[in-house]
């Protein structure tokens, strides 16, 4: 007889998917959320009318019976309920761990501060083109456990994983795993770069092959590659045999593996040096998982990129407008400024600001001084950004994103690009980064 009692910690999309998974497996469970108005509460109560739900507090007599806590990645590991459950002897893990225990199909695992969604989607498209039944999931789109049902049988899982998800995962053994890059982010949760990097490094555990960024020391595996683990790297320089990089020949830049030129960068639709790195990483991951080079390159030539990630909006009076609302941290914005600024004649007018998540905006000074004409600031941490950058370029303030678009139009000259890449989270003014990007795009289309 099974006496296990599961606690689902955190509602929302992930919590609902965990509850459905437990119900399918005939497990007893209760639910907890720190919020009084938990997202998805009405839907949960409609679907699970008999399951106890505790908001803001869980009684000790319940905690003492709990054997397993499956928590949403949004809940910090030092949340009191999780601490109490841990002290009472419960196992604590996340939905990716549940998936890892259930599936036998190979997994490609992808993390990194920036570029995860682009690379994950790109690898998924390459696998589809090669005829794989592929599940693209994790920190992107549908929660993994909603894809784990009797109707779907996948040949391959391509998982985008956040540092929070990796903190809660122990049994994943990917066919290939990568950390694309590591720059300061989520330091409000992880507190130090060391802890954040350590969380990312968990992705390599149990992997048959690892792909790292040879220009980013934080991505290099901490455990040196053992004989039975294949180590592959990518970077902007010319690659050594078996690795991936860029080769310059006769004024043309090529994506390359070893000495083999694969494709001129002009042939791919996603623009900027940072996107060339994303393309190289996707190629390396797909090939390591057994996808043919023909399918890989065909997809690269037609993949248009993802919304809100260095997405071209339009040109007005000789000025280009680019929506990079997904630039929610400094590293993403540095990549966007360097990637776009390094491939154009004019200057960038940068729209930035929002919730800075404890970041040090001084790190923007170097790329801003090289490529940016002026900055228009919005949002909660505008003061911090202004004090870090006001001596580098002219800084203007706007009370709304629509106002920032109007101001940016007057600052830009023909040949320039206006780039929305906020280097901040969006929740001070918007529902999420998608909403912020939609408001920007709509304002630009109205010019």
UniProtKB/Swiss-Prot annotation:
Reactions this protein catalyses:
UDP-N-acetyl-alpha-D-muramoyl-L-alanine + D-glutamate + ATP = UDP-N-acetyl-alpha-D-muramoyl-L-alanyl-D-glutamate + ADP + phosphate + H(+)
Superkingdom, according to UniProt? Bacteria
Its UniProt pathway annotation is: Cell wall biogenesis; peptidoglycan biosynthesis
Principal location listed in the UniProt entry: cytoplasm
Q: Which GO terms describe its cellular component?
A: cytoplasm
Q: Where is the signal peptide?
A: none
Q: What is this protein called?
A: UDP-N-acetylmuramoylalanine--D-glutamate ligase
Against SUPFAM superfamilies, the record matches this protein to: MurCD N-terminal domain, MurD-like peptide ligases, catalytic domain, MurD-like peptide ligases, peptide-binding domain
Subcellular localization is given as: Cytoplasm
**What's one GO MF term for it?**
ATP binding
**Keyword flag Magnesium:** no
Q: What HAMAP family does this protein's entry cite?
A: MurD (MF_00639)
């Amino acid at each position: 007889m099974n006496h296990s009692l599961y606690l689902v910690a955190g509602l929302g999309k992930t919590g609902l998917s965990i509850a459905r998974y437990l119900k399918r497996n005939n497990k007893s469970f209760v639910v907890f959320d720190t919020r009084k108005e938990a997202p998805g509460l009405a839907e949960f109560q409609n679907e699970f009318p008999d399951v106890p739900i505790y908001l803001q507090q869980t009684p000790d007599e319940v905690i003492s019976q709990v054997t397993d806590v499956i928590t949403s990645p949004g809940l910090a590991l030092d949340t009191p309920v999780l601490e109490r459950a841990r002290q009472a002897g419960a196992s604590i893990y996340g939905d990716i761990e549940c998936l890892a225990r259930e599936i036998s199909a190979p997994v490609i695992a992808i993390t990194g501060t920036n570029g995860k969604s682009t690379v994950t989607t790109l690898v998924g498209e390459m696998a589809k083109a090669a005829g794989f039944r592929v599940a693209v999931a994790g920190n992107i789109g549908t929660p993994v456990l909603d894809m784990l049902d009797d109707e779907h049988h996948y040949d391959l899982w391509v998982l985008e994983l956040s540092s929070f998800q990796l903190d809660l995962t122990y049994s994943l053994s990917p066919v290939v795993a990568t950390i694309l890059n590591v720059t300061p982010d989520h330091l409000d949760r992880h507190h130090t770069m060391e802890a954040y990097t350590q969380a990312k490094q968990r992705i390599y555990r149990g992997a048959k092959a690892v792909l790292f960024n040879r220009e980013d020391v934080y991505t290099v595996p901490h455990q040196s590659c053992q004989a039975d683990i294949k180590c592959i790297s990518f970077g902007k320089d010319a690659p050594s045999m078996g690795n991936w990089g860029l080769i310059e020949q006769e004024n043309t830049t090529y994506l390359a593996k070893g000495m083999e030129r694969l494709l001129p960068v002009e042939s791919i639709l996603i623009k900027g040096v940072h996107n060339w790195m994303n393309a190289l990483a996707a190629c390396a991951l797909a090939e390591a998982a057994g996808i043919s080079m023909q399918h890989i390159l065909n997809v690269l030539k037609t993949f248009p990129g993802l919304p809100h990630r260095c997405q071209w909006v339009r040109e007005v009076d000789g000025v280009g407008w680019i929506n990079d609302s997904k630039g929610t941290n400094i590293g993403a914005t540095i990549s966007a400024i360097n990637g776009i600024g390094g491939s154009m004649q004019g200057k960038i007018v940068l729209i930035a600001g929002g919730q800075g998540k404890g970041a040090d905006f001084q790190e923007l000074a170097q790329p801003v001084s090289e490529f940016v004409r002026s900055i228009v600031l919005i949002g909660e941490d505008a003061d911090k950004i202004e004090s870090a950058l006001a001596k580098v370029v002219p800084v203007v303030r706007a009370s709304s994103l629509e106002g920032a678009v109007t101001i940016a139009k007057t600052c830009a000259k023909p040949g320039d690009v206006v780039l929305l890449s906020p280097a901040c989270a969006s929740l001070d003014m918007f529902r999420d980064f998608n909403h912020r990007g939609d408001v920007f795009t709509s304002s630009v289309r109205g010019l």
